[in-house]
């Protein structure tokens, strides 16, 4: 919501790309550091450090994040949460944006929770080798995320979103079909999934942010975030019902989940194409 209010629409995807890259950087650096800190004391210690860093971050946030209160200073009464949710379901564009986010999460989080167990059970990875998947994939997205953001601003969010979804479908297909495979080939496929799977979140988040007027953006994005979190759990639950384990310990039916994820991705392209950008300077309903 802050990015949507502060960054002009023509540069918003680039800003989202940088933010996504910072998440990747935090993961690549933070996870090893967290594990190391745990060895120095116990598992509580990394969380104390994280809390301390969060408190420290409040200082630059206070001084450098601009105040965004133009839409609050109006004399209108504040809406209660029920009214906010009701307005979302009455606004076709916001409803499309909400459904768009849900469909993307169904596509993404039906696959992600089972990558690690599938790699160990079916592909031949050891528990120690799993870290290579996230280390290499996360490291490369540090560089690719800003590029995808710039492309989205230059060539259009819907077009770049469609391209990243189509490209992400390729590694999704192979990841969910793999048997025992050389580690280098597996890392190539999983890295492509990280690049394009995370990459599609950049134009899609920008599209959702731009679908709401500044006055309603914060409340809508909170509702959108909650719906996505619920969908994440639902997607993993559905995938868990489909995937089974045979007598040899191999996971079965992961390919069916892959087909489901690809279909959801195709549907998201269509739904995303119908989302409209609202006037970013209009603070009225």
Name what the model sees in each region.
Residues 145-156, 243:
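Helix-to-loop junctions at the C-terminal end of transmembrane segments
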Residues 39-51, 243-263:
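A membrane-interface helix-boundary motif in multi-pass transporters
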Residues 60-62, 259-285:
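Multi-pass alpha-helical transporter architecture, strongest
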Residues 66-98:
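Juxtamembrane intracellular "pre-TM" segments in multi-pass secondary transporters
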Residues 18-65:
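Helix-loop-helix hairpin linking two adjacent transmembrane segments in secondary transporters
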Residues 158-203:
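C-terminal transmembrane helical hairpin of 12-TM major facilitator-type secondary transporters
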Residues 1-22:
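Cytoplasmic helix-loop-helix junction between adjacent transmembrane helices
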Residues 94-134:
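Extracytoplasmic gate region of multi-pass secondary transporters
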């Amino acid at each position: 919501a802050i990015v949507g209010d502060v960054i002009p629409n023509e540069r918003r995807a680039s800003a989202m790309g940088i933010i996504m890259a910072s998440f990747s950087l935090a993961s690549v650096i933070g996870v090893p550091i967290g594990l190391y800190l745990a060895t120095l004391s116990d598992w509580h210690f990394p969380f104390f450090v994280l809390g301390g860093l969060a408190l420290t971050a409040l200082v630059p946030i206070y001084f450098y994040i601009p105040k965004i209160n133009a839409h609050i200073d109006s004399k209108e009464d504040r809406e209660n949460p029920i009214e906010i949710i009701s307005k979302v379901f009455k606004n076709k564009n916001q409803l499309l944006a909400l459904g768009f986010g849900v469909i993307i999460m169904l596509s993404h989080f039906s696959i992600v929770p089972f990558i690690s167990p599938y790699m160990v059970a079916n592909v031949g990875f050891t528990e120690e080798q799993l870290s290579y998947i996230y280390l290499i994939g996360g490291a490369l997205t540090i560089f690719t995320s800003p590029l995808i953001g710039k492309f989205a601003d230059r060539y259009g969010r819907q077009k770049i979103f469609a391209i990243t979804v189509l490209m992400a479908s390729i590694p999704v297909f192979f990841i969910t079909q793999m048997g025992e495979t050389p580690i280098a080939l597996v890392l190539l496929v999983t890295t492509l999934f990280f690049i394009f799977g995370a990459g599609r979140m950049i134009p899609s988040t920008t599209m959702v942010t731009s679908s709401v007027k500044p006055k309603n953006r914060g409340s809508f994005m909170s509702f959108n975030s909650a719906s996505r979190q619920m969908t994440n759990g639902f997607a993993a639950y559905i995938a868990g019902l489909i995937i089974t384990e045979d007598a040899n310990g191999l996971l079965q039916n992961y390919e069916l989940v892959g087909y489901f994820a690809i279909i959801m991705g195709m549907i998201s392209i269509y739904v995303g194409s119908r989302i409209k950008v609202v006037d970013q300077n209009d603070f009225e309903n």
